[in-house]
């Protein structure tokens, strides 16, 4: 309710899930971060070609994200209960549960903003896979937000409030939620086919520098 959403984020928290992951660093969190239990992924269409508006949007998202990963509300509202709250309030009383927020953009995003010349050479579509049956409504898009946490509601709350902040410039194209049975994180978790999924994933900084991070001069 609006009443609970208006409560200060210092409201007594649950006893578990108090570990947080910084939003700031050399690389974005959520890429090399140890796997969390839940993920909420959303792809957005961008409806402006104004670079200044897009820059402001990402600044606003940075402000929100830095608070969300610390388990705070995106904004502390005033005492007037008749006004709708800025934060939707689903995480009042919850800890951050290792929430990580990761943002990505597509080649179409760069094209819309006239930034195609900045596109890294290796930034291209994956080749077709045998027998794939892609549906247009689940392909493409301009911006992707990945929210991962050890509590599904925390991940959902983060994405919901980020979208609300930019709703005059973006619309949701598609979204997907998922989970992983990560156990004690000492072993690769099994997927729903019963296979251990990700055993061969790279794990060291040297390997990440080789296959994940780009040092393209154009970027």
Predicted regions located by residue number:
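Long, histidine/aromatic-enriched segments associated with O2/redox biology
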Residues: 2-219
